[in-house]
Swiss-Prot record:
This is Glutamate-1-semialdehyde 2,1-aminomutase. GO terms for biological process: protoporphyrinogen IX biosynthetic process. PROSITE patterns: AA_TRANSFER_CLASS_3. One of its GO terms (cellular component) is cytoplasm. The keyword Cytoplasm applies. It is found in: Cytoplasm. The gene is hemL. One of its GO terms (molecular function) is pyridoxal phosphate binding. Its EC number is 5.4.3.8. The modification N6-(pyridoxal phosphate)lysine is found at residue 259. Transmembrane segments: none annotated. It is an enzyme of class 5 (isomerase).
Length: 423
């Protein structure tokens, strides 16, 4: 069956035909047959250079030989035990060694579960109920943060099914806005348990913090006894060996991880200072548990991945990122497109917006229809990126310089189509 037929069949049994909404792009998503290295292949016979990379986990590319071999070996001796394993200790040591804020770590099943658990832990540690997030930030599909609101006011649900009383415990302020954050904390800081933030906002495209903003956030949270949680589900092990906190030089109280920590398999983690982490059950009164937490297959994939990520690895990946971003900038300059390319490390995106993008409102001023033309044109040129202006694109170690050159050439064509100079 072809992708079009499979999508129709899928909609009979799976809501919307997909297991996550962003995958349901028009007119229908392509269905994958296999993937290897930097390439992904669909059932229709097409091959793509993949810059979606499962939305970030695959920093080594698809089906990395070492990961495949060692995970396959683990499968032969069991896929779940319901008991601790030595490999959990090995992976925990890797995390603690790499992440500056990590003195202890707890493994869970996803990034969303990690953020939910970290927020609960922050509330348990501080004895306070309210939390702060930034507009447009995504911290998983749970009730604590799937909310929206105006600065200084309690949030309202961002989806049906979340009680208003739950949303009222969350505040949301614009990213990169020191004044709005300061005003809120001055108003209600005594009741705020934590501030959770994506260091780089990777679920609204790719928005970096302004110079000095992270230092400001760290200082004001410390001064007001508010725990600072870095959501590094995307940036953890992506930007540097020690994540975005190493990359930018600011250390939080707690860190949440997902994606890369599981080496392409379902896995999340949250880590932090020992005095905070020891409040988690069974040591302390903050409950957290899961049948598949610390699953041996995911743990092995995490070990097999992290062991390959040394400092030279990140230098090479940054070089690739700079190469592609430089090529994109040259295309934009030569053609005079009034758009904004962004990115850092091995992350990149183009906002179809002439102005700099510093926050959620700026991002949503982008031309979504033009982006859609760009996305579809890239597919025709054999390059796959996430089908949304508000996701980030990624580079893996499996991407060759030839791949990146081809991607740049495809972007040049796709921009011509987007601006109706071609196609």
């Amino acid at each position: 069956m072809f992708s079009k037929d499979l999508f129709q069949e899928s909609k009979k049994f799976i809501p919307g035909g997909v297991s996550s909404p962003v995958r349901a792009f028009e007119p229908y998503p392509f269905f994958v047959k296999k993937a290897s290295g930097s390439k992904i292949y669909d059932v229709d016979g097409n091959k793509y250079i993949d810059h979606c990379l499962a939305y970030g986990p695959l920093i080594l590319g698809h089906a990395d030989p070492k990961v495949v071999r060692e995970v396959s070996n683990q499968l032969t001796i069991g896929s779940a035990y319901g008991t601790p394993t030595e490999n959990e200790i090995i992976l925990a040591k890797e995390v603690v060694d790499r992440i500056p804020s990590a003195e202890m770590v707890r493994f869970v099943n996803s990034g969303g579960e990690a953020t939910m658990s970290a927020i609960r832990l922050a509330r348990g540690f501080t004895g306070k109920d309210k939390i702060i997030k930034f507009d447009g930030a995504y911290h998983g599909a749970h009730d604590y943060t799937l909310v929206k609101g105006e600065p200084g006011k309690s949030c309202v649900p961002d989806t049906k099914g979340i009680p208003l009383d739950t949303a009222k415990n969350t505040y949301s302020v614009p990213f990169n806005d020191e004044e709005a954050l300061s005003d809120l904390i001055q108003k209600d800081g005594d009741n705020i348990a934590c501030l959770i933030m994506e260091v780089v906002m990777g679920n609204i495209g790719c928005i970096e913090p302004k110079k000095g903003f992270l230092e400001f956030v760290r200082k004001i949270t410390e001064e007001n006894n508010i725990l600072l949680i870095f959501d590094e589900v995307i940036t953890g092990f992506r930007l540097a060996r020690g994540g975005a906190q190493e990359y930018y030089g600011v250390t939080p109280d707690l860190t949440t991880m997902g994606k890369i920590v599981g080496g392409g398999l379902p896995m999340g983690a949250f880590a932090g200072k020992k005095e905070i982490m020891e409040l988690i059950a069974p040591n302390g009164p903050v409950y957290q548990a899961g049948t598949f937490s610390g699953n041996p297959i995911s743990v092995q994939a995490g070990i097999s991945t992290l062991k390959q990520l040394d400092n030279q690895f990140y230098k090479d990946l940054e070089r690739k990122g700079n190469f592609l971003r430089s090529n994109i900038q040259s295309i934009i300059d030569e053609q005079g497109y009034n758009i904004t390319p962004v990115g850092c490390g091995s992350m990149f995106q183009i906002y179809f917006n002439p102005a700099p993008v510093y926050n959620n409102d700026d991002a949503h001023n982008s031309d979504a229809k033009r982006f859609l033309r760009y996305f579809r044109a890239l597919l025709k040129e054999g390059v796959f990126i996430p089908p949304s202006q508000f996701e980030c694109n990624f580079i893996s170690s499996a991407h060759s310089m030839e791949d990146l050159t081809q991607t740049a050439e495809a972007i040049e064509v796709a921009l011509e189509v987007a601006f109706k100079k071609k196609g």
